[in-house]
Amino acid sequence: MPRIRLDNLFGDPFALASVSISLLAWLIAFVSAIISSIRDSFPPIYWWNLVYMFLCIVGIAYVMATATTHIYSTAVVGYVSAGFAFTTFAADGLLKKQSGSNEAAGAGFILLSIVNVVWIFYFGSSPQSRSRHYIDSFAMHKEQPSYLNPSQMSNHYNNRPDTTVSTQPPQMYTSAQLNGFETSSPYGAPPGPSGASGIGNSQVNLAGTSSNGEAPNEVSPPTEYPYKAKAIYAYEANPDDANEISFTKNEILEVSDVSGRWWQAKKATGETGIAPSNYLILL
């Protein structure tokens, strides 16, 4: 489950402003609705509009605080579009009533409608669009996967935690350490340079494996890849890291986990490895 980080919300001027304005507009409509219910008559259906918009505001704040906009953007657009219809309908009905409290509630719904339009535009825009790029450029902690060129992405991801395969140096043996192996073979290898070489290689291989023939630090790859991702840039794997995989632009990959900066991916050819998430976009 994604972690809630308030830095993602307070460090993003757009997120902070839109959520704050929507909360202020909701409070205006809510307080005015209470006053209208006491003094005049407030249509009961509009209470559902207030509850629905409150849930939308909380949900959008959660999405922005967890930096999962790229995952839930489609759902957010759908919910906010329905909320826009609700708030517009409520504003039209309340402004027709000759009452100060109803008109104040209608003003709150109008302000909510304006924020809804802005949210529909933002969450409905592609991450590669210029408008989305411009808005996100003011954020302090937001990752911008589609706005960096490939060279910037490569440098941005060079500081990832090293994996077991890439950090473990090859085990080297000197001739002094291998001395005497030609006389200790249980297989009866012939003495001499050829026999010593064969037994030495056998001992080196056995030294790096466990009793059941598997490497002690080897991590088995996942068997399920529930997500699909599309490469927005071509990527060439680091030759010094056997865990990475190369892929071409627009290539479709299967992904097992979408958390973190590096995703475990599988190509159509069956090749598996890790890929930088900023080069991929979920489908």
Curated annotation (Swiss-Prot):
Q: Which Pfam families match?
A: SH3_1
Keywords of the record, alphabetical order, are: Cell membrane, Membrane, SH3 domain, Stress response, Transmembrane, Transmembrane helix
Q: What is its main location?
A: membrane
SUPFAM superfamilies xrefs: SH3-domain (SSF50044)
Q: Which residues lie on this side of the membrane: Cytoplasmic?
A: 1-14, 66-74, 125-283
**Does the keyword Transmembrane helix feature in the UniProt annotation?**
yes
Q: Which family does it belong to?
A: Belongs to the SHO1 family.
What's the stated role of this polypeptide?
Plasma membrane osmosensor that activates the high osmolarity glycerol (HOG) MAPK signaling pathway in response to high osmolarity.
Protein known as: High osmolarity signaling protein SHO1
Q: What is the lineage of its organism?
A: Eukaryota, Fungi, Dikarya, Ascomycota, Pezizomycotina
